[in-house]
Amino acid sequence: MTTPATPAAARGTRRLTVAQALVEFLGHQYTERDGGRPGEAPRRQRLIAACWGIFGHGNVAGIGQALLESGPQTMPYLQGRNEQAMVHAAVGYARQSDRLSAQAVTTSIGPGATNLVTGAALATINHLPVLLLPGDIFATRPADPVLQQLEVAYAGDVSVNDCLRPVSRYFDRIHRPEALIPAALQAMRVLADPVDTGAVTLALPQDVQAEAFDWPEEFFADRVWRVPRPAPDTAALAEAARAVRAARRPLIIAGGGVHHSEAEDALRELADATGIPVASTQAGKGALRHDHPADVGGIGHTGTAVADDLARTADLVIGVGTRYTDFTTASATLFADPGVRFVNLNIASFDAHKLSATALVADARAGLRALTRELAGHRVDPGYTAGYRAAKERWEARVDAAYAAPDPSVRPSQSQVLGALDAVVGDQDVIINAAGSLPGDLHKLWRARSRRQYHLEYGYSCMGYEIPAAIGVQLAAPDRPVWALVGDGTYLMMPTEIVTAVQEGLPIKIVLLQNHGYASIGGLSAATGGERFGTAYRFRDADGRFTGDPLPVDLAANAASLGMDVLRAATVGELRQALTAARAAQRPTCVYVETRTADTVPGAPAAQAWWDVPVAGTATRQAAVEARADYDRQAAARRRHL
């Protein structure tokens, strides 16, 4: 359907299809925020820097034609191989860009659209912007149903794209051309809003995409979305400062909001001025350099003994840009002091008020600097400082022991792989991971040296995120070496975007650890009475269980077949050489290493705090009975902070 041209088309309007108008509009959207340091000029960048796409009948003649006609100067196009992976790549780009620049993703209708759901959930949970443009069924319904349409007997206006509603921060379906104008503006508002941002979905019926309309020229004017830095309320700030001054054992928890706000320097200034120790969530790690005296490492179930011991005795917890997930709070068992109080600095009121806290609803950088000024002259007791610094030194010795590999001729453990990588990377390298046993080891062991070096997606902990995210990070930071760390389980979930990295000439590096199964869940299964059932990649044994020989799968050959250069490392010595070569490589390179597993050789220190994974309330197998007894003992320590 094409809307008839009107005489006004010659006076301040432009005749374009809906898809062409959307692409043109996106090419003129910008964000602006002040610089990362005082006195720096505001930085302006494209809000939507590029569009990923896989084309089918639901978008090829609409968005596809519009991208072709507009050209890369208006909207660069990136070709993906899997729709979920395209969202992961866009999310990696947005995170590396401090949420100031994002990417769009276009798909066809049907399975291409539903493949977006997992990536959308990841983006929304992590508060990272991505614009989703799935094709949709005909608005005019000339034939009903069309190819790949879901028929819902009780609702004719439902399509599979409605699956995206609960995982989107804004959802709209464009049934008419003129509806695009308010919808597109609302979409940009949400993407640029540090409180509301996440996945934004504009579902585009395939007939509407191709419909021509006379658009007002003002719709295509350059538009700047300014990202604010709201300051904390004066009364709340004074109350927070009083709480800090009264505390004897305060602890700061740095979350991802510190990075999103570029507040690392402000956090360091507060720690330097007051001596308050700083622990970090997975998203916040690297907010202080690992060698800063106040940095006590990761906190919670995957945290260090230093941070977790401080949390157990803290009488005041200052959360900065954190959501307090169960991994951070050890499932509500970590903050054990009977009188513990909370001060939460967060740009989102929803998060600032958690745990009955004194809420500082503000930008992290603005709030930290205001709190530092309010606390002028205040420092914690020297004995408290000396105690946590001594504990930090003891933990560093444990990290050294986990990294140590004195015999270069042996096959490495996972922690020795991390030690070898630690010795090779520089301050500007980026390390990406999301799932498996690596997040726990990295949170405890990795020595983060710069902002945005440590890139862990642990809001959704999505297997398959790492490789496409590495592509997005490399696009956002072309001068930084980017490493995706994956086990064989994660690799098998989503290796397809290796082809995209090869096509784009992006020199990402993959460290592929082969341990023949799901190591993390295998360990969790053993701890909860499951006896590692169903977690190994092995042939069936005589009893029908997967306990036979390892499967003869060559993942290194698979990576090579997709276009990567592959370096095989059988020993610690070969691993060090391969990592050095990979870092210098100018094309996609994979380092493949088979590791000794944690149940056969010592690795990273065990978990320092609990995580609530309910165990069978009744069972006949002794392992489950014993695991339930331990579960009941741990669960008794849970508490609500009121």
Residue spans for each PLM region:
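Conserved structured core elements
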Residues: L16, Q20, Q45, S261-E264, ...
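N-terminal alpha/beta PP-like core and its mobile active-site loop of ThDP/TPP-dependent enzymes
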Residues: T2-R379, G383, A420, V424-D427, ...
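Pocket-edge structural micro-motifs
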Residues: Q79, L204, S280, N433-A435, ...
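Phosphate/pyrophosphate-binding active-site segments
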Residues: T2-P4, A10, H175-E178, P216, ...
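Glycine-rich beta-strand-to-loop/alpha-helix junction loops that act as flexible
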Residues: A254-G256, V320, A435, V486-G489
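Thiamine diphosphate
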Residues: R141-Y154, A352-H353, V361, L368-R369, ...
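Active-site diphosphate/adenylate-binding microenvironment
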Residues: C51-I63, K392-A469, V473, D479
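Short amphipathic alpha-helical interaction patches enriched in hydrophobic/aromatic residues
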Residues: S168-F171, Y403, G563-V566
